[in-house]
From Swiss-Prot:
<keyword id="KW-0800">Toxin</keyword>
<dbReference type="InterPro" id="IPR041587">
    <property type="entry name" value="Cry_V"/>
</dbReference>
<dbReference type="InterPro" id="IPR005638">
    <property type="entry name" value="Pest_crys_dom-III"/>
</dbReference>
<dbReference type="GO" id="GO:0005102">
    <property type="term" value="F:signaling receptor binding"/>
</dbReference>
<dbReference type="Pfam" id="PF03945">
    <property type="entry name" value="Endotoxin_N"/>
</dbReference>
<dbReference type="Pfam" id="PF03944">
    <property type="entry name" value="Endotoxin_C"/>
</dbReference>
<dbReference type="Pfam" id="PF21463">
    <property type="entry name" value="Cry1Ac_dom-VII"/>
</dbReference>
<comment type="similarity">
    <text>Belongs to the delta endotoxin family.</text>
</comment>
<dbReference type="Pfam" id="PF00555">
    <property type="entry name" value="Endotoxin_M"/>
</dbReference>
<dbReference type="InterPro" id="IPR036399">
    <property type="entry name" value="Pest_cryst_cen_dom_sf"/>
</dbReference>
<dbReference type="GO" id="GO:0090729">
    <property type="term" value="F:toxin activity"/>
</dbReference>
<comment type="function">
    <text>Promotes colloidosmotic lysis by binding to the midgut epithelial cells of many lepidopteran larvae.</text>
</comment>
<dbReference type="InterPro" id="IPR048645">
    <property type="entry name" value="Cry1Ac-like_dom-VII"/>
</dbReference>
<dbReference type="InterPro" id="IPR036716">
    <property type="entry name" value="Pest_crys_N_sf"/>
</dbReference>
<protein>
    <recommendedName>
        <fullName>Pesticidal crystal protein Cry1Ae</fullName>
    </recommendedName>
</protein>
<dbReference type="InterPro" id="IPR008979">
    <property type="entry name" value="Galactose-bd-like_sf"/>
</dbReference>
<keyword id="KW-0843">Virulence</keyword>
């Protein structure tokens, strides 16, 4: 053919040194090294050289990233712009081209570093350089790729997007394969591998989505529209979909050796007619219907062409196709006649199966548009000759139907290798010929006979060959026969061809395979499928059952087929073939009819290859065995945390049931045993947070705002969330006491756990001293990579089998011996030393978690308190010294406490008439109660300074006296018949005339301010006629005039207390005002007093009836005679009561009402009258 002078006309693939320029839509694209040429070369490279290493890296440089410049990148954009009639704005265009150029420059540096490292792989400097170059390349691609997804330009940028993401996947594969040899840690390598597997799906779905969007956009009703539609479909199949279909092969753990793929999709050159793209209106749908529907791949054997004549013009009127199944198994089959069986000339049979098949057609078109329309004068649009050229390394002569022409199929489907003659470097071969026809010779205005040439990629081999040294992927459309009920359906775009579908159990298909390896070679079978149901796959060879396994559903019913819908699964049992030519059968069983099962391909993997499921099993076995101190699993290693055991359990649970069910069960039992051992050595009660505050004397105690949450993608078991607080004196807290009976003498213990995230989390261990750390752990919210979107299972449960970051013991946070905690770590540990054991004293160890800031928060779980090691040497001497200092301090504290307690008890007893503490002395006033309360609060170490809800050494005696103070307040409130007499509730219960205010003065003190002489405040009070009452008022007068508090009945019986600024008054000693909350009436008191402690105690759930546990509160660094102050102690009683300022006067009078109602009125004559409190209570009988 190459010697034929007619063929050697100056067309693009014969004159590459002088390429033609095609003009389409006003744009110029040089043919030769076009986007299609580059993409075809890349596809050939990916199909033949898909092995990681310098060869692959440098191959990408030669094909694209070291070859393509700005003009070629612009051609990628122009190609799609023309097809969809959309121009990319200049800014977006320049940005994309600049970024591609930057990636090209950076990748060339990366490739050179890779080449140098591969030549000297142990050189530390070159390993370091590779780590640097990988990080730079990965970061650049991560940043650049979003720029190729610009809003409104997703379709025009699609082909350069695919080039960029293909480069990204190749770089991620490099680090997955070579990262350890570059010196990267395993956690980083696994993280990047997880990125790789996730992005394969992400990039695939994006490309297919926007391909379909663009394809829909160019559809139209006429032949011109169909030409554009077909061109878009053909060219973007070559530049986008073919490349995308090979993305899964980048998964280096699933495809660790050379993998052979095949593209079975077909593309179509335009109907070979002159003026076809503009002459036939409303014909697009009929033209599309001329293309074969989805089908099994077959081998084109021959074309029998029939010739007709009209008005003396001879043309191709029809043809019949003879074909064979893949593997040439079985007899040939004949397709129905396309067109008409003309007899104007002898039929001509074109043999297609010579050499490597027909790779090129050169057609001659004929078009006649007569001046007179009528019988024998119709418009004629036909093909009057075609040359069929054969692919071959030698120069096979072409087959010619009538004559050759200039319409060259290579113009639409170029070769994949331009460095050799087209007969060797071709990319596609002719797979089928159909026909679009219209009109009859005796009636129609037009006669159209347009052969439609279908082409298949040359990677789709005539046979299903299985060698020994590679993974062989065989699309199931290469089957010989379909099972009854199986159909071929259109592929989703990323499978490289159509797929098979079944909706009921039964045989899927059979295919003939040819084994070129020794028959002793063993293989495993893998299946890439999608299914709406769980099912069982069966395989057999030559009728002999091989494998059977259960597999799970991958998608929901009615869902679209996406990359994530497909799963590649395999059988563990290897097999070998008995014959060099065998029939492989695949069936699907054990599912209900009406579900959908889709099969893309099967894979034959040499049994020696370790793939992902085996890798997972090996990794899980190593992780499980590493938990124990010995192979017989007697004990756990000390550094194995409870959290790590949970993560290993997840690793085991995620193993494939189909691949290693027995091994999975065995490993699961070992992990459960490890978990039980972990629970046994953990001295904490309820470490899994079944409840908080469930039992008063054991387990976890905590503030009411703490929540327990179920396991998620970070924690396998329950964990707690601690929020922030608005007042540091009312912190969020969680605590537990380790009983003395659980501890061993002179031993170090360790508290440890896992923190998902925290801010201002304070952790304490308290015995002789307080060990304390504040831990800030920035959280990602998940162990899953931030960009991972599928960490939720199909039922909403955490998907712990999704790619995640692995536990790394080197990142553990260790806070030993006062060292500062590594706050970036999620793991924490804090230790404490225990001296001698005294069960009567029951010091134990307090474990406390606390947050006292508004922005604070924490999520933590897997808490453990366990024995670490016996104390020896310096550590033993240190704990004995601390213990002695603590005992000395305790003895001194006991002496001081005895003195303070005696004084406080005497003050408290003096308030009451008897030891029953049910009645106040007649002269007991509020100041006396405050004074007694103040003395009670001088008792030290009633509560731990670290957390005021935990009782200290003197909690018992403090709570004894404090309870009596509460009783005194309650009795005092109960005998005051004036409601809201201290104005703590504003003006509630008072009648007001004119303008008055209630102001807060001197911290926690509310006073009534009467600023005007016309203002008046009054209250009606019910009393017992004939009984005596005392009216007591504490007030202050500013300026001239008098302030008056009057008591009277309806008629007469009036008395008053007057206050003046100019008269020397005796100030009531140490008089203060209570901060009680006012209770509506006497009956509601029920003898119970509510002080400012009320809110505090309710918040912390204190129960003073429970015997107090003692715990030391002395820090090792603070063994002094001074007391450690708790800054929040003032909120626990007397601290809320401040003395009255100078000038306040307390006055009282006796009053004997004659009726059951009296009125209390407050007013003034001039200046300002300030009233602190008004009391009216019965005299004692």
């Amino acid at each position: 053919m190459d010697n034929n002078p007619k063929i050697n006309e100056c067309i693009p693939y014969n004159c590459l040194s002088n390429p033609e320029v095609e003009v389409l839509g006003g744009e110029r694209i040089e043919t030769g090294y076009t986007p299609i040429d580059i993409s075809l070369s890349l596809t050939q490279f990916l199909l033949s050289e898909f092995v990681p290493g310098a060869g692959f890296v440098l191959g990408l440089i030669d094909l694209i990233w070291g070859f393509v410049g700005p003009s070629q990148w612009d051609a990628f954009l122009v190609q799609i712009e023309q097809l969809i009639s959309q121009r990319i704005e200049e800014f977006a265009r320049n940005q994309a081209i600049s970024r591609l150029e930057g990636l090209s420059n950076l990748y060339q540096i990366y490739a050179e570093a890779f080449r140098e490292w591969e030549a000297d792989p142990t050189n530390p400097a070159l390993r370091e350089e590779m780590r640097i170059q990988f990080n730079d390349m990965n970061s650049a691609l991560t940043t650049a790729i979003p720029l190729f997804t610009v809003q409104n330009y997703q379709v025009p940028l699609l082909s350069v997007y695919v080039q960029a993401v293909n480069l990204h996947l190749s770089v991620l594969r490099d680090v997955s394969v070579f990262g350890q040899r570059w010196g990267l840690d395993v956690a980083t390598i696994n993280s990047r591998y997880n990125d790789l597997t996730r992005l394969i799906g992400t990039y695939t779905d994006y490309a297919v989505r926007w391909y379909n969007t663009g394809l829909e956009r160019v559809w139209g009703p006429d032949s011109r529209d169909w030409v554009r539609y077909n061109q878009f479909r053909r060219e973007l199949t070559l530049t986008v979909l073919d490349i995308v279909s090979l993305f899964p092969n980048y998964d280096s753990r699933t495809y660790p050796i050379r993998t052979v793929s095949q593209l079975t999709r077909e593309i179509y050159t335009n109907p070979v007619l002159e003026n076809f793209d503009g002459s036939f209106r409303g014909s697009a749908q009929r033209i599309e219907q001329s293309i074969r529907s989805p089908h099994l791949m077959d081998i084109l054997n021959s074309i029998t062409i029939y010739t007709d004549a009209h008005g003396g013009y001879y043309y191709w009127s029809g043809h019949q196709i003879m074909a064979s199944p893949v593997g040439f198994s079985g007899p040939e089959f004949t397709f129905p006649l396309y067109g008409t069986m003309g007899n104007a000339a002898p039929q001509q049979r074109i043999v297609a199966q010579l050499g490597q098949g027909v790779y090129r057609t050169l057609s001659s078109t004929f078009y006649r548009n007569p001046f007179i329309i009528g019988i024998n004068n119709q418009r004629l649009s036909v093909l009057d000759g075609t040359e069929f050229a054969y692919g071959s390394s030698s120069n096979l002569p072409s087959a010619v139907y009538r004559k050759s022409g200039t319409v060259d199929s290579l113009d639409e489907i170029p070769p994949q290798d331009n460095n050799v003659p087209p007969r060797q470097g071709f990319s596609h071969r002719l797979s089928h010929v159909s026909m679009f026809r219209s009109g009859f010779s005796n009636s129609s205005v037009s006669i159209i006979r347009a052969p439609m040439f279908s082409w298949i990629h040359r990677s789709a081999e005539f046979n299903n060959i299985i060698p020994s040294s590679q993974i062989t992927q065989i699309p199931l459309t290469k089957s010989t026969n379909l099972g009854s009920g199986t159909s071929v359906v259109k592929g989703p775009g990323f499978t490289g061809g159509d797929i098979l579908r079944r909706t009921s159990p039964g045989q899927i298909s059979t295919l003939r395979v040819n084994i070129t390896a020794p028959l002793s070679q063993r293989y495993r079978v893998r299946i890439r499928y999608a299914s709406t149901t769980n099912l069982q796959f069966h395989t057999s060879i030559d009728g002999r059952p091989i494998n059977q396994g259960n597999f799970s559903a991958t998608m929901s019913s009615g869902g679209n087929l996406q990359s994530g819908s497909f799963r590649t699964v395999g059988f563990t049992t290897p097999f070998n073939f008995s014959n060099g030519s065998s029939v492989f059968t695949l069936s699907a069983h054990v599912f209900n009819s009406g579900n959908e099962v889709y099969i893309d391909r099967i894979e034959f993997v040499p049994a020696e290859v370790t793939f992902e499921a085996e890798y997972d099993l090996e990794r899980a076995q190593e992780a499980v065995n590493a938990l124990f101190t010995s192979p017989n699993q007697i004990g756990l290693k000390t550094d194995v945390t409870d959290y790590h055991i949970d993560q290993v359990s997840n690793l085991v649970e995620c193993l494939s049931d189909e691949f290693c069910l027995d091994e999975k069960r065995e490993l699961s039992e070992k992990v459960k045993h490890a978990k039980r051992l972990s629970d046994e050595r953990n001295l904490l009660q309820d470490p899994n947070f079944r409840g908080i505050n469930r039992q008063p004397d054991r387990g976890w105690r905590g503030s009411t705002d703490i929540t327990i949450q179920g396991g998620d993608d970070v924690f396998k078991e329950n964990y707690v969330t601690l929020p922030g607080t608005f007042d540091e004196c009312y912190p969020t807290y969680l605590y537990q006491k380790i009983d003395e009976s659980k501890l061993k003498a002179y031993t170090r213990y360790e508290l440890r756990g896992y923190i998902e995230d925290s801010q201002d989390l304070e952790i304490y261990l308290i015995r002789y001293n307080a060990k304390h750390e504040t831990v800030n752990v920035p959280g990602t919210g998940s162990l899953w990579p931030l960009s991972f979107e599928s960490s939720i299972g199909k039922c909403g449960e955490p998907n712990r089998c999704a790619p995640h970051l692995e536990w790394n013991p080197d990142l553990d946070c260790s806070c030993r011996d006062g060292e500062k905690c590594a706050h970036h770590s999620h793991h924490f540990s804090l230790d404490i030393d225990v001296g001698c054991i005294d069960l009567n004293e029951d010091l134990g160890v307090w474990v406390i978690f606390k947050i006292k800031t508004q922005d604070g928060h924490a999520r933590l779980g897997n808490l453990e308190f366990l024995e670490e090691k016996p104390l020896v040497g310096e550590a033993l001497a240190r704990v004995k010294r601390a213990e002695k200092k603590w005992r000395d301090k305790r003895e001194k504290l006991q002496l001081e406490t005895n003195i303070v307690y005696k004084e406080a008890k005497e003050s408290v007893d003096a308030l009451f008439v008897n030891s029953q503490y049910d009645q106040l002395q007649a002269d007991t006033n509020i100041a006396m109660i405050h004074t007694a309360d103040k003395r009670v609060h001088r008792i030290q170490e009633a509560y731990l300074p670290e957390l005021s809800v935990i009782p200290g050494v003197n909690a018992g005696i403090f709570e004894e006296l404090e309870g009596r103070i509460f009783t005194a307040y309650s009795l005092y409130d109960a005998r005051n018949v004036i409601k809201n007499g201290d104005f703590n509730n504003g003006l509630s219960c008072w009648n007001v005339k004119g303008h008055v205010d209630v102001e807060e003065q001197n911290n926690h003190r509310s006073v009534l301010v009467v600023p005007e002489w016309e203002a008046e405040v009054s209250q009606e009070v019910r009393v017992c006629p004939g009984r005596g009452y005392i009216l007591r008022v504490t007030a202050y007068k500013e300026g001239y005039g008098e302030g008056c508090v009057t008591i009277h009945e309806i008629e007469n019986n009036t008395d008053e207390l007057k206050f003046s600024n100019c008269v020397e008054e005796e100030v009531y000693p140490n008089n203060t005002v209570t901060c009680n909350e006012y209770t509506a009436n006497q009956e509601e008191y029920g003898g119970a007093y509510t002080s400012c402690n009320r809110g505090y105690d309710e918040t912390y759930g204190s129960n003073y009836s429970v015997p107090a546990d003692y715990a030391s509160v002395y820090e090792e660094k603070a063994y002094t005679d001074g007391r450690r102050e708790n800054p929040c102690e003032s909120n626990r009683g007397y601290g809320d009561y401040t003395p009255l300022p100078a000038g306040y006067v307390t006055k009282q009078l006796e009053y004997f009402p004659e009726t059951d109602k009296v009125w209390i009125e407050i007013g003034e004559t001039e200046g300002t009258f300030i009233v602190d409190s008004v009391e009216l209570f019965l005299m004692e009988e």
